[in-house]
Amino acid sequence: MAYKFVDNYRERGARKQLVDILKKKGIEDEGVLKAIGKVPRHYFFDETFWNQAYRDIAFPIGEGQTISQPYTVAYQTQLLHIKKGDKVLEIGTGSGYQACILLELGAKVYTIERQEKLYERTIQVLPYMGYKPKFFLGDGSKGVPEYAPYDKIIVTAGAPLVPEELL
């Protein structure tokens, strides 16, 4: 599949504005803000909706899933206190945006997605963008035990309770 992404002054300016909004909302981790300012969020949207990419809102990405609100991504990432080389398990790859933020911070990312269509798109788009987490298709409630232990675990998927396997 061929991708043709554009990232010009308009998108870069929109990312800068988004970073300013996140600062005003209390995000202080400079590494997180720098990562948000670098990762082109519009690449995770259908081109028709690129004008929505830098609003601080969640947005549908198909399969009944959404790309998380940028504030949520920044807040959760800030709470993780990522250090270069941290081994991070992400439950719920979704669009792949959160994985890219973690990779920008120097984490080794292991990400699992249960929706096959999202997984198939993400395993193509992220490497095209230069991001190479370890991808898995499956039930994230069980984690990815063959690569455990992890330094950090982030759950970006909804669940009625925290699975015992992740504790």
List where the protein language model places each region.
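Class I SAM-dependent transferase core
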Residues: 1-89, 97-101, 105, 118-121, ...
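Conserved nucleotide-cofactor-binding alpha/beta core module
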Residues: 81-167
